[in-house]
Amino acid sequence: EREDYQQLILEYLSETNGYRIRKNTDFQPKLAMDTAVLMEFLRNTQADQLEKLERLYKDRTEETIINLLNNEILKDSRGLMDVLREGIEFDNGTTLTLLYRKPETSINKQAVANYEQNIFSVMEEVYHKEGERIDLVLFVNGLAIFTVELKCNTSGQSYEDAIEQYKQQRDAKTRLFKPRAGVLAAFAMDLNEVYFTTELKGHSTFFNPFNIGDNYGKGNPHHPDGINVSYMWEDIWTKDTLSFLLERIIYIKTKESRNPDTKKAKRTKSLIFPRYHQLRAVRRVLADVKKNGPENNYLIEHSAGSGKTETISWLAHTLATVHNSENQNIFDTVLIVTDRIVVDRQLQEAIQGIPHKAGQVKVMDDKSHSADLASALRGNTKIIVTTIHKFFHILQQDLLGKIKHKTFAVVIDEAHSSTHGTLMQAMTTVLSHKYENSDGDDNLDVESSIIEEIQKSGKQSNVSMIAFTATPKPETIQLFGKLNADGHKESFDLYSMKQAIEEGYILNVLDNYVIYKTYFELQKKINDDPEFKSITAKRKIARFIDLHDTNIAQKVEIIIEHFKNNIMHQLDGTAKAMVVTSSREAAVKYRYEFERYIKANGYSGIR
């Protein structure tokens, strides 16, 4: 039955997607290549370049090309992705292209023709070493890019068996699985679910789901033909989608860390491949923008644990180059607006990490001012990253609407949580103990302010806003949401908290919470006293008790002792606890009491 499943995929790839089916004897394990297809691609597309090389290398031309290509792929500074995107160069200055990009426009007929010359192929039952056989290997221009291990649920096996096969029975040190030089992703599939990894590490290999989601949870919706993962060959492994992944999405992330003992800096590289919802969100927005231009706003409701930073980065880079049917660039500038006081390093690294031309990205750091942002918006920078506070000043001036000759895509990061001075106000209140002068109104956030400003000026015809949030307010849904068949506004793309929890990216805190009740009695005279509004009075008294030092100290003792004795050892010592407070002012007071209690008791390892 597994063999029938495999043949179904092969037939679709061949007959519908235009793949070539190659024999497993064509595979060269030490190179992770099908060199015959590689050389055919080069001869069909770059005959003049090959002629130059043949004059130099004579009858060793093919050998020289293959060896140089393999050496470049194996370089730590390059890898397969860089070689596919940038090609290779020889001593005489001759360059060879290994993958032709799909052009954004149809103006350049030769570029379109070159793209059509890319050769996608597939092999079954591939031996990457003696005794170890892979079900399917996918190639582009003779270079292996994906492996697939298939399992059939009707035979009593599932994707979990495929994952264990990768972990226990596949040598991660072979050329096919060498990190960043071998395949870009290894897929584990059954009839219902798909998982992938970008690096085999034996038993510690981590597999991500690549599933659509079912009823807001994990898995995939039921497919009439009984194969719920058919989107893999019907969509993901089509030439256009694979090209999009190779050209615009997959990238190498470099992370710097420092050994706490030796203080030595360490750089680690990892290949970033999207989860299904990330790719879906980017492509959905692109498709709608291509059709409608900067006409619409979009709400991307992605839960915590969704990989939002990468999704924003991919979307920004693709929006910066997207063209309409008339071959016109839709957006002159993409503006990424983050809710931090300063643009955080994680977002900067993700934006800068995706390959782009020099000068294409500008980050408004803490030394920049609103005037610098205004200047950049009037200039030619394609992607600008700024804080929501600088952007708010731009919005108040209606600057985007005034620059009518330019079009803007504004990507708002975490639209629900941005605050306009309320955190600092809470800090000041706590430190000065001015409880009576503050009602703790935490609703004065920038999201509301932005909505108010947009509603004042209306939707600008040259501005499209894409709001990312995990928990949108009703006003946010009304402003950014799309109209559904029932006449209600909803998110343009949704990755729910339920799915994130079921897929294991966030913990369900409701499964692990402890209730601590505070009892107090309101004097009856408040209800009868005309000098007081009952609700207001009760709120003030409740707030006074809630923020009282003694009350907080008692709760903090229980929280920390419970965490220390029951929680912190879990998840290999990385477990965390969440404390939900009634206001930002309360959060600050709890933070100070946590620090005081930990220090007073000499606890280490808790922060």
Q: Each PLM stretch: what is its role?
A:
Residues 1-333, 342, 346-357, 379, ...:
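ATP-dependent helicase/translocase motor core
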Residues 381-414, 418-429, 443-454:
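Conserved RecA-like ASCE ATPase "motif II neighborhood" in helicase/translocase motors
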